[in-house]
Amino acid sequence: MPVVVKFVRQLAHDLRNHLNAAELQSAYLIEVAENEELRDEVKRLRGMIAQVGVSLQELTAALSPPRLTEMPYAARDLMEDLQQKLSASYPAESAAVKWDDASADAQLNIDPQLLLPALTELFANAFRHGRAEGPITAAARSENGRFVFTLSEPKQNFERSTENWGLEPLHSPGQGHYGLGLHRTRAIVEAHGGEFAASYDKETGSLVTCITLPLAAPDA
């Protein structure tokens, strides 16, 4: 799989170079075109080219090792920010999530600009992939010097293996999605010195994702 990832990153880089050339050419055509309608069409084409470039940039970013800019962050603030982000992005779905934040005064040292989207990705998957009847529950606590976050989502007849959860990029691609979300989330968690795991609880019919992060040192 590392070879495939390297190939995709190089391919995306090469395609972006071609898109940059097309962008420059379209800018030139806008300048020399005498017909206003033609200029408008070239501008529209330029916008399409730019969107492809954005998609390729997002693809390569998802496959690149995370670069952290860490700062002290209260676990309670992280949970509050996560709830606000979910409410803004998924107002209907997030309203039904049950929260249990027992992290108390736990302190973390994280990059919130990376970790918040990584956690949001877990909820996005829970909202749109094979959800069964029942509430999604999210819980946070501190335990043995670690911050523990668990997400439980109801799923019936779940048969996928969770052994390599988040270790198989490009596994389930679809239109506009390339199977990179869990891979990126896991990479970000592990870059923070954390652990990422998932298991299926047959008794409750729930897929349980567990993330642990080290608590900040007392003087952090």
What are these regions (language model features)?
Residues A21-E36:
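Conserved C-terminal segment of the DHp
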Residues N125-F127:
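Short helix-loop "hinge" at the ATP-lid/N-box region of the Bergerat-fold HATPase_c
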